[in-house]
């Protein structure tokens, strides 16, 4: 009895919230019911609002009458409200009008309960509950203005039906807790017909979802514990290494200068550091240096996996520099310094050679004019032009080689490990872009200097031709008086 009272209270509250006077639904509350009865009896006052309501009452076909049980008894009882409803028989398509009793919202529980629970011959209730289709069919044959949603809600709140629908693989009885479940009702669509198979399916789905939630919560707790311990160990190892790696692009960026030789030296030093670090990481055993070099090349050829986080052992082994690595770094740095000196000497010779050629060209021109030797001036002019062209070609080749070498050194001297953060990658990219812009500016300056030198050469050639022509005419004029 307590479960029935709780069910009545919950269902009644839901009905009043859903189908009350405030909600615009196709239902009839007690207040609206009394107003319709007054309008049909002629006691309702006329107004604009009543005119609309009166039109609605006439369009629906409400009328007063006596219930069937009162008609059989023949006694004069209170009249009830009926409405005309179009019905069809099961065989034909012909429609006919029949009267249905108007169901009041406040009486929904009693109406559905009387149709849902079967009664015995003596009026006693049998513990047999009908399904949704059966209950709604019995209600629709006698009542109107009672939606299917209310029937579905009632069946979902019925504790007896819930016990019957509850799955029991062991065959044991279940205890009635007196409270209908609320989780299932939120998952059900009340506007669709619900069968026993559908209810069992929804029940199984609910049980499976609860089991999945429990398992996922346990697994997530275990994963959080293991992940937190693992990440704390990795972060402690990564902190020092990341700081060193973040400082390296800044130092390289600060040491760059407008001079190409300074940039090449910085690129060589960074390349030496990276090669020494890789050699120190992969060459742990000092006994076999050739095998260490092979393994280093094989590991450099392997692609970097950016998704996997490196372990602490790998990070410490990659960034450990031992004595052998420092010796190799010093040797390699000495070789780079010697190469750098050779490049500087070549560039100094190349830069001095054009000035020397110009001075020799001027001196040759003056000597040819003074002496009047046509062959010597022509030969010297040709030789100076050839030397000047050769110096320009060699200078261009050296410059292009130096630019390509600087690009390769700048590219190879900045290896990007998989664990670098976005800030470090951005700083490396910014330094590379700045060095590239400087190289482009230098190339533009060199091209401009070459373009300015080309017209000067063209001007020198006509002057040489005029000088030779003048020297050729002078001996001719001197020979004429002798002839």
UniProtKB/Swiss-Prot annotation:
Compositional bias, Polar residues, is annotated for 229-254, 262-271, 302-317, 351-363, 467-483
Q: Is Nucleus among the key words of this record? A: yes
Going by the entry's taxonomy, the superkingdom of the source organism is recorded as Eukaryota
Against InterPro entries, the record matches this protein to: HTH_NOL4 (IPR056549), NOL4/NOL4L (IPR039788)
Principal place of residence: nucleus
Please list where the region (Disordered) is annotated: 210-418, 435-483
Segments of skewed composition (Basic and acidic residues): 319-330, 340-350, 364-374, 391-409, 435-451
Q: Where is the composition biased (Acidic residues)?
A: 211-225
Which UniProt keywords are given for this protein, alphabetically ordered?
Nucleus
Is Nucleus given among the entry's keywords? yes
Please state the span of the N-terminal signal peptide per the UniProt entry: none
PANTHER family per record: DEATH DOMAIN-CONTAINING PROTEIN, NUCLEOLAR PROTEIN 4
Q: Know the name of this protein?
A: Nucleolar protein 4
